[in-house]
Amino acid sequence: MAKTAAKVRKKVKKNVAEGIAHVHASFNNTIITITDRQGNALSWATSGGAGFKGSRKSTPFAAQVAAEAAGKAAQECGVKNLEVRIKGPGPGRESAVRALNALGMKISSITDITPIPHNGCRPPKKRRI
């Protein structure tokens, strides 16, 4: 019994003028996802995916490289205006926003959406270095 060849679907190129850049900056990594207004992902990049491993992932430079990669992919989809939403306490917060701005994208607003507990779960113990 011969197998029929699977139909190859051509990837539909999205053309979106406005987008939202979600920057998730943890202590260990930085994840940048650029979505349209409805929340559908257009492009994404991480510090680890940009070639940084171990403790180098948690540097501002790694976040900058990841933001440039995500931004260039989003520009191919036609994104020109961005709204930035930052979540997390990581070191890559500022540099990711600066990298997106340096690509020539117009940033309309920067919002910090870091979740803050109203006395919820007990936090992890303090680090002793």
Curated annotation (Swiss-Prot):
One GO BP: translation
GO molecular function, one term: structural constituent of ribosome
Biological role: Located on the platform of the 30S subunit, it bridges several disparate RNA helices of the 16S rRNA. Forms part of the Shine-Dalgarno cleft in the 70S ribosome.
Superkingdom field: Bacteria
Organism, scientific name: Aromatoleum aromaticum (strain DSM 19018 / LMG 30748 / EbN1) (Azoarcus sp. (strain EbN1))
Cellular component aspect of the GO annotation: ribonucleoprotein complex; ribosome
InterPro entries per the UniProt record, alphabetical: Ribosomal_uS11 (IPR001971), Ribosomal_uS11_bac-type (IPR019981), Ribosomal_uS11_CS (IPR018102), Ribosomal_uS11_sf (IPR036967)
Gene: rpsK
Protein name, UniProt field: Small ribosomal subunit protein uS11
Family designation: Belongs to the universal ribosomal protein uS11 family.
Keywords: Ribonucleoprotein, Ribosomal protein, RNA-binding, rRNA-binding
Pfam families: Ribosomal_S11
Subunit structure as annotated in this protein's UniProt entry: Part of the 30S ribosomal subunit. Interacts with proteins S7 and S18. Binds to IF-3.
HAMAP family: Ribosomal_uS11 (MF_01310)
